[in-house]
Amino acid sequence: MLHPRARTMLLLSLPAVAIGIASSLILIVVMKIASALQNLLWQRLPGTLGIAQDSPLWIIGVLTLTGIAVGLVIRFSQGHAGPDPACEPLIGAPVPPSALPGLIVALILGLAGGVSLGPEHPIMTVNIALAVAIGARLLPRVNRMEWTILASAGTIGALFGTPVAAALIFSQTLNGSSEVPLWDRLFAPLMAAAAGALTTGLFFHPHFSLPIAHYGQMEMTDILSGAIVAAIAIAAGMVAVWCLPRLHAMMNQMKNPVLVLGIGGFILGILGVIGGPVSLFKGLDEMQQMVANQAFSTSDYFLLAVIKLAALVVAAASGFRGGRIFPAVFVGVALGLMLHEHVPAVPAAITVSCAILGIVLVVTRDGWLSLFMAAVVVPNTTLLPLLCIVMLPAWLLLAGKPMMMVNRPKQQPPHDNV
């Protein structure tokens, strides 16, 4: 016979598994459609027209039209494609289901069009909204927060291909003063995260790790080097934090999302021309290309980091539907490679992992997620103690500092102005 605690944990197990599978399938379908549209826009269509896919006119044209298309979706779709991600945390309150079709279309257009944002925020919003809406009908006695936690855990597992990230994140959010043990509260979310991760693994494997030279033994000087690298990444990230609300306010003075996103897409196109095709899109595949290209110099890595960070700020400020974590990881990789090229005595494993830790910490203000991203991009167990130590001064630097989010004015409606 199972203990009553075990029976309590099992109550939400089946819904948790179902939510994890559904969260992954929604992500997979969206990414497959976006990939097909991306191939059409950036491979087949320019080839048919006899235009180079890295032609400045093509890059500017596609991104400008992408901005206009996303603006039209936000302007005319029911619910205006959900809330502006620049004003929302990664895990937020459920939105009305009527806003989801527009949000999905806006996300697919942005991913395919080369916008420097990832899928994490919109996918999270979609999955939370569906889980709350369907769960409230099927099991009305379960509160909305439980459905929100299960959906967000399933989505995190699906996004990263492992339940580890969900375990780390929810170990801090669910660790309250309740007498219920932490792992009792983590049981159902981890079931959802595991189901999401395993389902994603059936179709594709998220590839985060980079082919960076193995790091052997930690030295005391490496801790200082890592802390300096993280501080540099934090400084770069805080420039973006300062710019985002100001640019967002300036762009939204125009009130018309079609105009705002059209201009935003045009600016992204110019940045894409300067940075080249590797500076476009969400950044995960592109950072693999960046590491594989042995011809890049210190100045090239610096340019890519600056361009990607600027594109991230412009895309978020313009109202494109997307997340900021994946492009931030690209910025961290570019910064890390630049610093290694500048000071070869510091191993690339340290510069890249600590730069990722610093920039993701600025974007998410989540220590566990920052450690996780640094550890999966540069998978080396020798680095883990160093990263944990480097996290301490990095966290001190950011204590009390503003987050990479825009405070929504009180008079502004729940969704974008139209």
Swiss-Prot record:
HAMAP family attached to this UniProt entry: CLC_YfeO
Keyword Amino-acid biosynthesis found: no
Organism domain of life: Bacteria
GO molecular-function terms, A-Z: chloride transmembrane transporter activity; monoatomic ion channel activity
InterPro entries: Chloride_channel_YfeO, Cl-channel_core, ClC, ClC-type_chloride_channel
Protein's recorded name: Putative ion-transport protein YfeO
Keywords: Cell membrane, Ion channel, Ion transport, Membrane, Transmembrane, Transmembrane helix, Transport
Organism of this sequence: Escherichia coli (strain SE11)
Membrane topology summary: Multi-pass membrane protein
Location of the protein in the cell: Cell membrane
